[in-house]
């Protein structure tokens, strides 16, 4: 239930902030069902528009970043990287592996 929760990002990758009585803290991981739905939507988006993404590679990479960031919040990074490896080109998988630390740093996320 998102009552009383301030969402700083209503689209993936979400960062949901909750007031703990003194300050707002990141409570994104408290909403796994919402994150699972975001992950599912990212996968569907990536699968549904292959020709579009061939022309707009930056948008493709942005959606991959969203999917990876969401998977990290769900502690499913390995599963998502395996998904990328089996469903996309080797170049895409190599890009994801190469960029994972940058993605983590830019989004303020850490591997668990």
Regions found by a protein language model. Give the residues of each.
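Acidic, small-residue rich beta-repeat scaffolds with periodic aromatic anchors
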Residues: 2-112
